[in-house]
């Protein structure tokens, strides 16, 4: 039975995700590299801000860091409680998940790669999708903790499978985003009212999350709120393309999309939302999508 839970990494997602845990668990430890943020979380949500060495003595340990390298470096420097389950919500590299799962198993520690989707609004409302790779028994034991932060908690395969699904999901997001930018620029060039076109498409077969929420709320509004940073989308599309190459599959659309997102990231303003990738296409066409 889970007696204590820890959350490591209180970024835009982690801060909101960890807030739900005290509703279900008596002891919830939080740690962040900027420790003032952990103390702020404790004050706001009733968690316990502790040093990293204490956090990794919890029964279930969540991590939500920028990259798999960050997670591996952190794990190498701590002594984790035997019998614990480590749930990594980072959008990470499948091979890294397999390495960590194998290494930690020798210490009687289970590792689940469990990236999430749903952006900050999903983290705030505990409606995230959690895609989980790893041992099924560990998944079942950790399920109550994951259910505190998400709506759909889905086991998708062995170690690395969760990271793989997340990478492909975000690649498909990028494909959708770029194709909608091209399509709507074409419509605007022909004098079509974009709001009217959006109404039609969202009641037709071409609709997607991009047309239903991202384009109207971020692009056409020109707001581009930063909830998922463009560099992170560039990272995830890179992971997805690596999976394609490892499988020796042809994927011309995915390859082209990854190169476009990478280029958009390199030319974007600092701290840009992923949706601002369309600005590079706007610069090419001199058509502003609004």
What label would you give each PLM region?
Residues 30, 63, 88, 111-113, ...:
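Hydrophobic residues in well-ordered beta-strands that form the structural core
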Residues 28, 48-49, 110-111, 153, ...:
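Hydrophobic beta-strand scaffold residues
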Residues 65, 76, 91-170:
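Rossmann-fold dinucleotide-binding core
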Residues 44-45, 82, 107, 149:
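Short, structured coil segments at secondary-structure junctions
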Residues 52-80, 84-94:
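Rossmann-like NAD(P)-binding element
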Residues 1-56, 60-63, 90, 120:
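NAD(P)+-binding Rossmann beta1-loop-alpha1 motif at the extreme N-terminus of oxidoreductases
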Residues 161-285:
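Helical "substrate-binding/catalytic lid" subdomain
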């Amino acid at each position: 039975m889970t007696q204590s839970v820890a959350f490591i990494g209180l970024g835009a997602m982690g801060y909101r995700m960890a807030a739900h845990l005290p509703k279900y668990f008596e002891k919830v430890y939080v740690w962040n590299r900027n420790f003032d943020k952990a103390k702020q979380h404790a004050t706001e949500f009733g968690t316990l801000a502790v040093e990293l060495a204490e956090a990794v003595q919890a029964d279930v340990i969540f991590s939500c860091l920028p990259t798999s390298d960050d997670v591996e470096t952190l794990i190498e420097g701590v002594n984790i409680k035997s019998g614990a389950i480590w749930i990594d919500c980072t959008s990470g590299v499948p091979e890294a998940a397999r390495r960590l799962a194998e290494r930690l198993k020798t210490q009687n520690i289970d590792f689940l790669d469990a990236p999430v989707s749903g952006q900050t609004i999903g983290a705030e409302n505990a409606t995230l999708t959690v895609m989980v790779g790893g041992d099924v028994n560990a998944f079942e034991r950790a399920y109550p903790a994951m259910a505190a932060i998400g709506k759909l908690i889905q086991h998708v395969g062995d170690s690395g499978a969760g990271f793989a699904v997340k990478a492909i999901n975000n690649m498909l997001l990028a494909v959708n985003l770029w194709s909608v930018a091209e399509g709507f620029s074409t419509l605007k060039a022909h004098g079509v009212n974009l709001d009217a076109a959006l109404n039609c498409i969202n009641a037709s077969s071409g609709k997607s999350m991009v047309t239903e929420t991202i384009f109207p709320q971020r692009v056409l509004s020109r707001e581009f709120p930063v909830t998922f940073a463009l560099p992170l989308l560039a990272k995830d599309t890179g992971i997805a393309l690596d999976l394609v190459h490892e499988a020796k599959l042809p994927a011309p659309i995915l390859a082209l999309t990854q190169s476009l997102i990478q280029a958009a990231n390199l030319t974007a303003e600092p701290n840009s939302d992923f949706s601002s990738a369309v600005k590079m296409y706007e610069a090419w066409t001199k058509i502003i999508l609004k």
